[in-house]
């Protein structure tokens, strides 16, 4: 649940008034996991109701489950002007077949997904292949951020200005984000791949930043 509340049914399970925050910038999210092959119903139960449907191909999945906001423990990643807050929603510690979901809050003027990393090669335990999307929201509607998407050989080399509600697909390569000064940034990451592990490779040019 991005914001507001909804009644949700997945298979034979149902939950009322799922959702506990007025916006993505206030608090942690409630979420519901629904496996493949079972019906999913969502009905708004508040005037404001914003829902993100995050899905990936799967054959079996796991049992339907409510993942309450109280179970999402915020933590910091980075420091100084790379500090951001992470809300892990459906990562490796929760059952699913291929889906990984997390959200990140980046203060105005800070960099995120930084130092730049990638996960486009199946080379476990160094790196896993994961497709990914970024769903961006800005704390003010006129706000913006900049997302880079590039590869080592620069066969892909894009700088994208993103606004409130924009989605960026990461087909491959490194993908750092910068929040414009004055505009706090939220993004929802949805990832999936043949191996459900988040293992990344940092851009060698910037690996020294981790020392």
Regions found by a protein language model. Name each.
Residues 41-42, 59-63, 110-113:
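Short, well-ordered, mixed-charge alpha-helical segments that flank or form enzyme active sites
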